[in-house]
Curated annotation (Swiss-Prot):
Segments carrying motif 'HIGH' region: 6-16
InterPro entries on file: aa-tRNA-synth_I_cd-bd (IPR045462), aa-tRNA-synth_I_codon-bd_sub2 (IPR020751), aa-tRNA-synth_I_CS (IPR001412), aa_tRNA-synth_I_cd-bd_sf (IPR008925), Glu-tRNA-ligase_bac/mito (IPR004527), Glu/Gln-tRNA-synth (IPR000924), Glu/Gln-tRNA-synth_Ib_cat-dom (IPR020058), GluQ/Sye (IPR049940)
The keyword Transmembrane helix belongs to this UniProt entry's keyword annotation: no
Transmembrane regions listed in the UniProt entry: none
NCBIfam families for this protein: gltX_bact (TIGR00464)
Protein name as catalogued: Glutamate--tRNA ligase 1
Keyword Cell cycle recorded: no
Binding residues annotated for ATP, in chain numbering: 238
Functional note: Catalyzes the attachment of glutamate to tRNA(Glu) in a two-step reaction: glutamate is first activated by ATP to form Glu-AMP and then transferred to the acceptor end of tRNA(Glu).
Organism (species): Campylobacter curvus (strain 525.92)
GO MF term set: ATP binding; glutamate-tRNA ligase activity; tRNA binding
Family of this protein: Belongs to the class-I aminoacyl-tRNA synthetase family. Glutamate--tRNA ligase type 1 subfamily.
Keywords for this protein: Aminoacyl-tRNA synthetase, ATP-binding, Cytoplasm, Ligase, Nucleotide-binding, Protein biosynthesis
Main location: cytoplasm
Length: 431
C-alpha cells in the first residue's frame, strides 16, 4: 500500500506533487493500492480550504486514492498507543521546560558539540513522575542499537542511537508530533511503501523505532527522492513561483506536461514525451538519480508545447474553452507560444472585432471591404491574388493590413500556413 500524506498548510509544492505521482504510479504497477492522508494535526498552521485544493489538484492529474484519511480523526489512537509505550517503558514523561532545554542546547553549542537529550527525566522513578504536577511531553527512548533500513534509491542507510536520540512523540497538549502520528497512521492504514522527499530521511529511523516499540512487525519499504533545485542550482524555496503547482496552472501549463516533466527529472526514460499511463509500463523507482535535479521552466514550456500538440480535439476544447473545431488552430499557434493563455489570446484575436492599425487605416478598410465581396478560395495564393487585384495594393501596404485583418496583429506566423485553418470562417473573421 502506497500513500500520499500532505499537510493543508499552504499551496502544493511541486516536490510534494512529484512524490504523489511516483507513489501513484508504483501503486498501479504492483496493484497494491494508494491512499491519501491529510495530515492536519498542526492546527495553528492549517489553512481552511486547502484539503479541497489538494483533492482538486490530484484529480487534475488523474490520481484517484482508494481511501481518504484525516489524521486528526486518529487522535484517540495516537493517545492510546502513546500510553502503551509509557506502560511498556519504551517512552517516558519529560518535564523539562523550554528554558531548561534551551540552556542545554546553548551550552552544547558553546562547547562545539551536537545537542542530545541528556536523559534527565528518563531516570525519574515512577513515584517521582506521579508526584510531579508540571506539564510534560512524552519522549521515545533512544534506541540501544543502530537503526538501519534499505532505501530503494539511496541504498543501505544507518543511524547511530545518538543521531536518533530521545525524541518527543506527544506534546504537552496531548497532541502527537509529526513523527508519531505518521508512524502510527502508516501502521494502522496498512502502508507498506513510502516514497517521499529526502528531507524525511532522518525521520525514518524514528518512525521505525516507534512501530518497533509498539510491536509492529510489518515490513516498511522506503524511497527518498532527491530535492529539486531551481535553475541557479539552489534548493527551491516555497516562496519561488515555480515551486507552486497552483502557479504553474495559472501560467497555462497542462497537468499532463507537469507530470511528464516531474517524471523526467533525474530519470532515464525511453522517450521525452509521455503520459502517466505510459510511464506505468516502464517506470522504475530504483532508477531515479541520487543527485538533485534542476527544475527548468523553459524545459517545461517545451514539454507543454508538445502536449498541446498531442492533445485530442476534445481535450483542447476543454482546456481552452473553445469549440473543438478550432483545435488545429490552437496546435498551429504552438509555434509561437507554449502556454495556454498566450495561445488562447492569439486565437481569440482572430475572431474578435479588428481595429485598423494607425499607419494602415485606409489600406485596412480597402482590404476589408474587398474581402467581403470575394468568394471562398481553396488556397492562400488564389485568395491573395484576387484580393491584390481587387484593391490594387501590394507589398507592405497589402500584407501588413491583411495580417491585421486576419489575425489582429501586425506580426505573426506565415499567412499562407494560417489560411487553410481559417478559410472556412473568413466571413466571420473579417465582419
Amino acid at each position: 500500500m502506497y500513500r500520499f500524506a500532505p499537510s493543508p498548510t499552504g499551496d502544493m509544492h511541486i516536490g510534494n506533487l512529484r512524490a504523489a505521482i511516483f507513489n501513484y504510479i508504483c501503486s498501479l504497477q504492483d496493484k497494491s493500492g494508494f491512499i491519501l492522508r491529510i495530515e492536519d494535526t498542526d492546527k495553528e498552521r492549517n489553512i481552511q480550504g486547502k484539503e479541497k485544493d489538494i483533492l482538486e489538484i490530484l484529480s487534475k492529474f488523474g490520481i484517484k486514492p482508494q481511501q481518504i484519511y484525516i489524521q486528526s480523526e486518529n487522535l484517540k489512537f495516537h493517545r492510546q498507543l502513546a500510553s502503551k509505550l509509557l506502560i511498556d517503558k519504551k517512552a517516558f514523561a519529560c518535564f523539562c521546560t523550554e528554558e531548561e532545554l534551551e540552556a542545554k542546547k546553548q551550552k552544547a553549542k558553546e562547547e562545539g558539540v551536537a545537542y542530545r537529550y541528556d536523559g534527565t527525566c528518563e531516570r525519574l522513578s515512577d513515584a517521582e513522575v506521579l508526584a510531579c504536577d508540571k506539564p510534560f511531553v512524552i519522549r521515545m527512548k533512544k534506541p540501544e542499537r543502530t537503526m538501519s533500513f534499505t532505501d530503494a534509491i539511496k541504498g543501505e542507510l544507518s543511524f547511530e542511537p545518538d543521531a536518533v536520540d530521545s525524541f518527543v512523540i506527544m506534546r504537552t497538549d496531548k497532541t502527537p508530533t509529526y513523527n508519531f502520528a505518521c508512524a502510527v497512521d502508516d501502521m494502522l492504514e496498512g502502508v507498506t511503501f513510502v516514497i517521499r522527499g529526502e528531507d524525511h530521511v532522518s525521520n525514518t529511523p524514528k518512525q521505525d523505532l516507534i512501530r518497533e516499540g509498539l510491536g509492529y512487525t510489518g515490513k516498511m519499504n522506503y524511497a527518498h527522492l532527491p530535492i529539486l533545485l531551481n535553475i541557479e542550482g539552489k534548493k527551491m524555496s516555497k516562496r519561488e513561483n515555480e515551486s507552486s503547482v497552483k502557479w504553474l496552472f495559472e501560467q497555462g501549463f497542462l497537468p499532463e506536461a507537469i507530470a511528464n516533466y516531474l517524471i523526467l527529472l533525474g530519470n532515464k526514460t525511453p522517450s521525452e514525451i509521455f503520459t502517466i499511463d505510459e510511464a506505468v509500463k516502464w517506470f522504475d523507482i530504483t532508477k531515479i538519480s541520487r543527485s538533485p535535479a534542476r527544475f527548468d521552466v523553459k524545459k517545461l514550456e517545451q514539454i507543454n508545447r508538445e502536449h498541446i500538440k498531442l492533445a485530442s480535439d476534445d481535450r483542447i476544447a476543454e482546456v481552452f474553452g473553445m469549440d473543438k473545431n478550432l483545435a488545429n488552430l490552437v496546435r498551429f499557434y504552438t509555434q509561437e507560444s507554449s502556454l495556454v493563455p498566450e495561445i488562447k489570446e492569439k486565437v481569440n484575436k482572430i475572431f474578435a472585432p479588428k481595429v485598423a492599425p494607425e499607419e494602415y487605416k485606409s489600406e485596412f478598410e480597402t482590404i476589408k471591404n474587398a474581402a467581403k465581396n470575394l468568394g471562398e478560395f481553396e488556397n492562400f495564393d488564389d485568395f491573395k491574388k484576387a484580393l491584390m487585384t481587387a484593391t490594387g495594393l501590394k507589398g507592405k501596404n497589402f500584407f501588413m493590413p491583411l495580417r491585421a485583418l486576419l489575425t489582429g496583429d501586425l506580426h505573426g506566423p506565415e499567412l499562407s500556413e494560417l489560411y487553410p485553418l481559417i478559410k472556412g470562417d473568413l466571413a466571420r473573421i473579417i465582419a
